[in-house]
Curated annotation (Swiss-Prot):
GO CC term (a single one): cytoplasm
Binding locations of substrate: G70, G71, R92, N191
InterPro entries: AceGlu_kinase-like_sf, AcgluKinase_fam, ArgB, Asp/Glu/Uridylate_kinase, Glu/AcGlu_kinase, NAGK-C
Species of origin: Salinispora arenicola (strain CNS-205)
Family stated for the protein in its record: Belongs to the acetylglutamate kinase family. ArgB subfamily.
One Pfam family matching this protein: AA_kinase
EC number: 2.7.2.8
The name this protein goes by in its record: Acetylglutamate kinase
GO process annotations (BP): arginine biosynthetic process via ornithine; L-arginine biosynthetic process
Amino acid sequence: MSLTADLARAQAKAATLIEALPWLARFAGSTVVVKYGGHAMVDPELRRAFAADMVFLRYAGLKPVVVHGGGPQISSMLDRLGIDSEFRGGLRVTTPEVMDVVRMVLVGQVGRELVGLINTHGPFAVGLSGEDAGLFTAVRRTAYVDGQQVDIGQVGDVESVDVTAVTDLIDGGRIPVLSTVAPGTDGVSYNLNADTAAAALAVALRARKLVVLTDVPGLYANWPDTSSLVGEITADDLAKLLPSLQSGMVPKMEACLRAVRGGVPAAHVVDGRVAHSTLLEMFTSEGFGTMVIPA
């Protein structure tokens, strides 16, 4: 390669760094809660890219906190064990048998793998679950299908959050990685929807942003019309749109709505199938995905 071509490549890299400068200045010292899920969890290259993104945020002066789901891995393990599973209203029906698998996969597999990937870049990540240090307390929830309330078993909503353990880790320069299993006040363990848990944590931490990784480019106002992709939407407009959304997007957009109405300045849904999507959202002028802002 010629010297001119090498210089052009170097200048392009420098231009990218300079473009990020105002965003680095704006978000320095800010807490960012990132919900990790979808295809980004199952593709090896995307997993490595996500881990690198979190370390980049840490070195750039931000305070990333990761809340992960594990839907694909849970489904795979249930299939291997011959345990039937179903979804109602976008949420997994969680029997006691399914709950055992959920805990095993989230805490023992997905969380540990992500911690390991992040720590290939340095001793940053520490794994926690909602059962540790009273982080989350859950309350049983139901789902709605066609306007009817239905039972979904040991699925919980977040009743309370104690961020002491998380803030201690952040203050120590660590990257907390949270699995969403939590005890209820009734003594039963619950499977928290990771989107819901991420929103509650973002509010409790007074985070600057909530970023939710999905398997679509963002929110569509009129799915499957791909021209209806929404770049930015207010909380009030999102609340009006929620009843018409596809069931899989409802928990994600509800989480964004809860976060913004709880005081988080902005919540974002980004396409986790695109490598470094979190950085594209945080540090480019164009942004990426759909941003939810207060009314």
